Amino acid sequence: PVEIAAAIFKDGHDILRAVVRYRPARSRKWLERPLEPIGNDRWQGSFEPSELGRWHYVIEAWVDRYATMLDELDRKLAAGQVDLAGETAEAEVLFGAGELDEWRVAARGLGVKDRHRKVSSATLEADVERELARFGAWYELFPRSWGGFKGVEKALPRLAELGFDVLYLPPIHPIGTTNRKGKNNALVAKADDPGSPWAIGGPEGGHDAIHPDLGTSKDFDRLVAAGRAQGVEIALDFAIQCSPDHPWLEQHPEWFNRRPDGTLKYAENPPKRYQDIYNLNFDSEDWRALWDALRDVVLHWCRRGVRVYRVDNPHTKSVPFWEWLIGDVRAEFPETIFFAEAFTRPAMMTTLAKIGFSQSYTYFTWKNTKAELAEFLELLLGWAPYYRPNFFVNTPDILHEYLQLGGPPAFQARLVLAATLSPSYGIYSGYERFERVPVAADSEEYVDSEKYEVKQRALDGPLLPLVQRLNEIRRTEPVLQRFENLRLLDTHGEHVFAYAKGTEIAVAVNLDPRLPREDVVVVPAELGLPEEFPVYDLLTGERYHWRTGRNYVGLVPGGAHVMKIGA
């Protein structure tokens, strides 16, 4: 349900009534549910949308003249006032002739129908999305390292067995040859270097085309259908950028940024430079046609069966554009999910959430100490009504120092944190094999990055049993499928991080990848648990006796408890 809370008040002592009126954006018919006063001028209620898509709702309040009149009469009678001729005459005007008890019956209906001095809020909007927008496990892979679409299709049963809900593919389009990057981001590519998939566009086509090395259009369609049959949705990357060989460079030169001398300006995000990519110019005089073309790209893939999009750097494009595009796409395909790759300022991250993005990458990757995690999670809890995080433990661009130096225990700890803190989380291929060698000591880039070369991949990493078990736990424990029920638990030291999800699950993780750690986890009385209660570790099968108050834990490097409370 959509929960409603509002402050509703006016001068004087009149009794008020309030409702929430709501409808699908496509409909003109309003539905209605009452709001109830909860004290101190606060009102609350809810409504249950019946379909996916955008909904409009408005809060309406008015003076209930009938209830106000009856309340005044009752208070005067209670005070012993017997001469109520004037009040009775007023009541007869409102209710018609009759006794006081009859007036009370009439008032109950009239107070809803007669909306005296009615006022309304501005019309508000809510996006109603399917469960995958809130809860899901993501796996990212480069299809060229798996034998193209046919090879990826063969991996689907194993991905489904491991408990993944979404398979995210970096761009699958033709790759430009002009200024192509070589191995490890070399400025000059060798003849057999495949280039970066984010350098989109070549003689074979642009954003609506498929790289021929990955397979045919039929191969792609079969992959999407096979994924859906296995319960694994295919997510595509939507990157608004073009290689120098993209067809749009010739067809629409006015869509691109140029220097004063007229030369094209390649993309930069200092200190990073992308000589193989040109950005589109959202200030172009032909912006309307540009918007339409980009919208049509998404609609093209929607019509091919794709309903999930990871959007590359949306914070560097026009916010009104995104609001328009998402609304237009969802008008035809309301189940479409947009995942923002927006590592940026909080105001922009939350704005993208409010204008339609289903979920977002976060700064989780860089929060590794107890203090960092606590501060970060409290921030996200404040955003919970409108912002859904997706905790990726790594990406092709991000190999954090904690993983580089911490080894397998660090990978285990971060996996447990991501999978049990956030309803949506993800891993990029290689994480399960503990891949952790950077291109340089001070870099977060992988050496021999898959962005610039083809690897031979298979689902055979030693971390996969833990991945599978965590995904099983997530599916069987509903409290892990929500974020707003997170409660951080106190510990005495700095190396054990603990938290509860509702009153059903408690988690403790050793953040130290080098040393075993002992600590005390404090279960607060506010959780309302018994003085003593059993807990069952869903990872190890061990049972313990815990209590409200202090509880001892001892964990190996990177180790964790995922406790089922009361089991």
Question: Residue spans of the language-model regions?
Answer:
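Carbohydrate-interacting/catalytic domains
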Residues: P1-D165, P174, G227, A353-G356, ...
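Acidic/aromatic-lined carbohydrate-recognition and catalytic surfaces
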Residues: L52, A61-A97, G111-Y274, S284, ...
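Alpha-amylase-like alpha-glycosidases and glucanotransferases acting on alpha-linked glucans and related
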Residues: P194-A225, A229-V232, C242-L459, R482-F483, ...
